[in-house]
Amino acid sequence: MSRSLKLAAITAALVSTLPAVAQQTTQEGNWMVRARAVNVDTYNGSTPIPSLAVPKDAIHVESKVIPEIDITYFFTKNIAAELILTVPQKHDVKVKQSAIGAFDAGHFYLLPPTLTAQWHFNPDGNFRPYVGAGITYSDFSGDQLHVPGVTRLHLDDSYVGFAVQAGFDYKLTNNLFFNMDIKKAQVRSDLENDAGVKVSRVKVDPILVGVGFGWRF
């Protein structure tokens, strides 16, 4: 075979591999990290405290906006697991009605890491909706709660509840995505007095709406 024919054959072989090489270089990684700003809208459910004339749902936990980081691993194009993290968040507590009127009951800190299994639709498109379900582990700490002039109050240290979510990623570049996400989480605790007697059940059960960006690698 002449040199020119060999060169033509090699060139043809190299050109034929270009689509596969291009596909490999643009293939998305299994990991995604997102940063979001999340509005925590608390449910504010609670059982009554008859001894203080506190009616049902009169204990209100502050709603607020918090930072959030999540780490997602894609097992396949459609199936993923997401770990949602933040730092302990301070929540003020108010009692809207009681025998001594409305009052500020203090505050507590809440750390609610959440793990969900997800199904991602349209994984090769720019618009990629998903749904998920899993568990939330709520760690309550630093509680400074009280009924003025009557007693101090305490929350149970932890609670494990369900979580569901829906959202979407929108592809901006090969690695960068815009994200919106909504979650509902079970976050609950028993409220006890200094003697360790349960006086109420508090249901924070927030709806969390987040907006942010993700990086896939």
Model-derived regions, located:
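Cleavable N-terminal export/targeting peptides
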Residues: M1-G29
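Short glycine/proline- and aromatic-enriched beta-strand/turn motifs that initiate or cap beta-hairpins
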Residues: Q23-D70, R216
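Residues that define the transmembrane beta-barrel architecture of outer-membrane proteins
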Residues: G29, S63-P67, H107-P113, F127, ...
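Membrane-spanning beta-strand positions in outer-membrane beta-barrel proteins
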Residues: M32, A80, N126-R128, K171, ...
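Gram-negative (and chloroplast) outer-membrane scaffold detector with strong preference
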Residues: N39-D41, D70-H146, P206-R216
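Outer-membrane beta-barrel translocator domains and adjoining extracellular loop/strand segments
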Residues: G45-L52, D92-I100, S141-V150, D190-V197
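Outer-membrane beta-barrel domain signature
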Residues: K56-H60, A102-G106, T151-L155, K198-S200
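Predominantly the C-terminal beta-signal and adjacent terminal strand-loop region
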Residues: K90-K94, T173-F217
